[in-house]
Amino acid sequence: MSEIQVVCVGVITIDTVALVDQYPHEDERVVAEEIIRAGGGPAAVAAVALSRLGIRSAIVGTIGDDADGKEVLRIFEKEKVNTSGISIGKFATAGSVIVASKKNSARAISTRQPVLQSPINENAKKLISSATWLHVDHVGIKQIAEAGITRGVGPQISFDAGYGVEDFDPSRVDLFVPTDRQMALRYPGVDLSVALENDSKKADNTVVATQGSAGSSGFSPQTGLVTASGFKVSVTSTLGAGDVFHGALIAQVIQGFELSVALRRANAVAALSCRGVDGQSMIPTTAELNAFLEANK
């Protein structure tokens, strides 16, 4: 267990994804180019991204005692993600039905969230206490105290702040990563660069905003404001790209890249993941990432 570098805590799902040219209208039938079942969930996808990039990762969350739960475990085993911190709950494994539109380069999601997260088990607590980083999503952030972790006590904390963080105190975490839309809700009418600086200086941490295909921007006390453009790839689906970015960013930080370089590399990983229908299948390895960056200097 001590070998685990990053523990990801949060939502684990099995997704059914339909790739269509354009979204159906009400009462309309469209023919999908492809329909697949794949693993999903912000924390889960980040854990897979970390593993693909050579970081020893573990996932902590709740699944059901059902066929979907068994499929979750199979996927993580294949991806070499430690699952000893997963708990088996009383309810069905969380899942989503997702329609990904090629024309719109977007996706629409209907999700069945886990009804109740099981308490963090002892294996999970041991994994977390000995890790270098703890990465949490909108569900995992609510379980930090349960794991006995606060900022400065235990691993560094990264937060995938994709939902409802208008009033979140960023000083609770070391790496605060909302979307640009969430930052606009936190700071209405304020330029993104100013908003990032405000949160970073207030919390004395690193704050990064994802900006979709435009890339990402960040601010830390050490670097000041940095920005990194996105990459153009042949997009099949953007599903999970943000979750991939979060895992990739932590991987680059662990591997010693300074913030501006880490953002550029994480942008590239997220872009390359968009070649797949689902959020996981086309996440690159570090070798593939380096080759892509070499070709796109």
Feature annotation, model-predicted:
Residues 132-198, 206, 214-215:
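Conserved beta-alpha-beta core of the PfkB/ribokinase-like small-molecule kinase fold
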Residues 23-32, 177-180, 226-228:
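Short glycine/proline- and charge-enriched loop/turn segments
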Residues 48, 73-74, 197, 260:
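Alpha-helical segments flanking ligand/cofactor-binding loops in enzyme cores
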Residues 6, 56-57, 83-84, 157, ...:
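Hydrophobic anchor at the start of a short beta-strand
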Residues 50, 179, 242:
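Short, conserved phosphate/pyrophosphate- and ester-handling motifs at nucleotide-, phospho-/glycolipid
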Residues 1-4, 166, 192-297:
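Conserved phosphate-binding/catalytic region of the ribokinase-like
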Residues 1-60, 67-71, 234-235, 280, ...:
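Glycine-rich phosphate/adenosyl-contacting loop at the front of the ribokinase-like
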Residues 26-30, 37, 52-133, 290-297:
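Conserved N-terminal subdomain of the carbohydrate kinase-like
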